[in-house]
Amino acid sequence: IREELGVNSYTAPSIQLLFKELNALKPIPFEKVWRDLPDSTPQDRARLALSIGAVIADGFLTVTAEKQSGIEPIGRVLLRLAKGLGVGDHVTKHSRSIIEKAARKEWGDIRKELIRSQAEVEAALLGLKDEEMAHLVALGGWLRGLEITTSIVHESYTPARASRLIQPELMNYFLDRVSTLNPKFKKTKLGTALEKNLREIKRITTKPVNTAVEPDEVTRVRELVREINALVSGGEE
């Protein structure tokens, strides 16, 4: 069904790829890259899908940093958002398992539950023939992941660390997906910022081989992705 609806291998793995990036960027200044989890449920499906992906990315950050106190809130918020999108039944068991495993500090198992949560949400959306929302879950995770990684690199810059921000395949993939989004959504403040800022991020991070992203460019990418994520969590239409 994934092939049939045009969802290729980047959709499901995209958020869990953040684990590789975070492990490469350790030690993680957790308090400086953490954010308050969303305390409300967006009313529109696009922001809901993006929010689910972002919270899964927050979960990966918390697992990588082994912050036990942060796991239970993530499990509860993830379930609330999934219910808002109409796929709560597919996440309930994973949310419960995440909370139970956090009490035992079973980090590897929590990671697996987060990965399964995205897969279940994606499968449910594809079952509803809602390919667009499945892509937005993946995009939401990637955007939050980019905010986290640019913040870590900004905190302790080296050219090698900054080189991890160059992801041309993912950039092209998500820009292609954004170009096909519902025209009504693309006219919203979030939709406009999403396309405009992603194109600017691509411009900044498109580099010749062995050319680093400079410190001021890291700062600019962080600003651009933060603007998008603030619109996702802040509710501005």
Question: What residues fall within each predicted segment?
Answer:
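N-terminal Sec/ER secretory leader and immediately downstream segment
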Residues: 1-98
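Generic structural concept
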Residues: 53-56, 75, 79, 115-118, ...
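Secondary-structure edge/capping motif, primarily at the C-terminal ends of alpha-helices
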Residues: 59-66, 85, 89, 124-128, ...
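Extended amphipathic alpha-helical interaction segments
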Residues: 101-187
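A cross-kingdom marker for long, charged
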Residues: 182-237
